[in-house]
Amino acid sequence: MNPRAKPGTNGDNPPPARMVLSLLRFASLLFFLLLLQVRPAGADWNPLVERLAADGFDRRTVEALFTRQEARFEPDAMAGKIRSLIQSLTPVPDSLAAKLKDAVQEKYLTSWMVARARSYLRENMSLLEEIQARYGVPKEIVVSILLIETHLGENTGNRIAFNRLASMALYPDLEAIRPYLGASLITPDNLEYARRRCREKADWAYSELKALLRLAARDSLDPMSIRGSIYGAIGLSQFMPSNIFAYGVDADEDGRIDLFAKPDALHSIANYLHKHGWKREVDIRNQERIIFAYNHSTVYANTVLAIAEKLRGRR
């Protein structure tokens, strides 16, 4: 017999039921306390609710949204944005800058990817020629953008756009997301820049959040059902919500602009480029400038143009 066993028990037997129950209760309490510790401090949505209500949104509707199970504070949205902005401050050597000027994303120029884009172009030729005639934007450019943005509509993002935008809008104060940035990222040299950009991006996200809510109300959609990219871009064409109002096209004339519907998405891409200056005869420099407006990256613009050239059979 185990000399340490309590009277009336065998040391090899399980403890009494009462002890097991006590241990389970203690474990549950410990888990709950740990959960409180790791829960993001920004889970209080009240400041955002107040701001939206002051801007005319129905308070009860907004409060109901933020109390739903799907509503989550996702600090990585703003943290990722600030991290990329700070990293962009690193000086680029002249030799590398010269290479980047003409750089492309090679993964979109493989024979397999170009073949997919060419097949998509053939399958949707009638629609794309209609778009080209209406906006003056070459069909190859439209398909190239679609290939890069969502792999021809196959990957439109699986994040809840509401959460991404609300999380960024909630905290214009850098200190609130600083714990998620890493200890060495913020330095005395970039601190003020990071603070300013955090405020600016929070304001931008708030404007986009309002546009998302207006879009959902207009089209009778559940805001939580709208999925998008890590920063809240939506649909095959990856438009921010405000751009849907500015450049979206109801091409299939069903009474709503649905960027998950092919006709609306492709027309909207071309309309965006057209509204930014694309004409039937536009030189290469202006082509680069206009595509850059769609996605602020020189490499992106270069890649769109390179894919389009391959689709035309010139490269």
Model-derived regions: residue spans:
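Cell-wall glycan-active module
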Residues: 1-5, 10-12, 16, 21-25, ...
